Amino acid sequence: MNKSMKILIFGSKGWLGQKFKSFLSKLDVLFAEAQTRIDIENKNNIIREIKEISPTHVISFIGRTHGFIGDKEYKTIDYLEEDGKLVENMRDNFLAPILLYEILKNTDIHYTYIGTGCIFEYKEDIKKVQDEPENCYKFLEEDKPNFYGSSYSIVKGYTDQYLKDTLNILNVRIRMPITEYNEPQNFITKITKYEKICSVPNSISVIPELLPYIFELMKKKYSGTINMVNPGVISHNEILKMYQEIVDPKFTWKNFTLEEQADVLS
């Protein structure tokens, strides 16, 4: 058992939290799963749990991207666009990670926040990537969010800016997470279920490949923001073409334009 680190995981029952637990178990790293819900009313209980466990590191996978309304399940961030969901969005996507920061900021405990890269939108003045497709542009760690097309992205953008330059925090941006399994949260699985696809070059995060890097940065107590994505870009159509070739030769899909997508979302 590696006793040089003791990691307390918030959001351990979520998709990425479970992936991280499995990864740590294989490394024989000591970790604990937080039992207290991150809520301002639970602040004293959170502090008590942290003191009892006495971790060297805290990592948060807390976030809200889906949920139920009545008997209907919303599996995407469309859930947060429904009436009455702003409070839930603010609670889980802004207040929870900020509350953890406020609790930990005067301690020696390193804090890793798993955030998102879904806070950026292509603009003509964004820096071009060398040797990449003509319509591909690069966002850097110091760039500020510029996408306000969803309630989720707006709230996450403010969280990102609040935490990005704070001491003793690793702010990790992931984008379109992919794994090797057919599971609902896998980006590949998601887009195979869509009726139409708006295909644009984008960054992706292949989770099994990137978890070791997150862990190494945690171990070194790295502070700052990192765009935790794989090199280069790939379009939705390229992903689906590989899915068709490797998984299901009978699979087909339809495209629509950004303008048509905007009409649907408006």
Where on the chain are the PLM-derived regions?
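SDR active-site strand-loop-helix element
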Residues: 10, 61-62, 111-117, 123, ...
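Catalytic helix-loop patch of NAD(P)-dependent Rossmann-fold dehydrogenases
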Residues: 82-96, 118-172, 179
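A short beta-strand-loop structural module common to alpha/beta enzyme folds
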Residues: 29-41, 253-258
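Substrate-positioning beta->alpha
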Residues: 151-154, 176-219, 224
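N-terminal Rossmann NAD(P)H-binding glycine-rich loop of SDR-like oxidoreductase domains
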Residues: 5-26
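NAD(P)H-binding glycine-rich loop region in Rossmannoid oxidoreductase-like domains
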Residues: 40-93
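Conserved cofactor-binding/catalytic machinery of classical short-chain dehydrogenase/reductase
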Residues: 42, 92-99, 110, 158-159, ...
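Mid/C-terminal beta-alpha module of Rossmann-like enzyme folds, strongest
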Residues: 213-265
